[in-house]
């Protein structure tokens, strides 16, 4: 099993990054190699703009559910489309490096699309995970209308799972606290 933390970035950054940064296609080769060896991949995605305890616990739990964890980060442009002007606070390559430093994350990639669906389709992880606060119904089951990636996962027979939100720990709450709100 790999113990190195590999950062996989968008192609345009490949020439300016350290040798352990790879393009999406190389990530797919590595993920598929591990899947063929019988390992269960876990995939999650998000902006992860200001890292906090809720993120860390979420990612640790995601990693426990499989043999390796792939984290797909929204690019700066994608984050702005989702969160609005002024975001992200931390540039994508810095977010990627920060996330790759966490021992629970095996692979990091950056995606620019509106959703991670195309990347999920390429990698076909055994398990797709999202935070329960993000996409659950009142009974705690995944709300497929809020999880566009879930349809992709279901098409190839993967599992969609939710991880409970850690109350009081969110990027929105952290930003409000910093602003004195």
Model-derived segments and their meaning:
Residues 3-181:
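Nucleotidyltransferase catalytic core that binds NTPs
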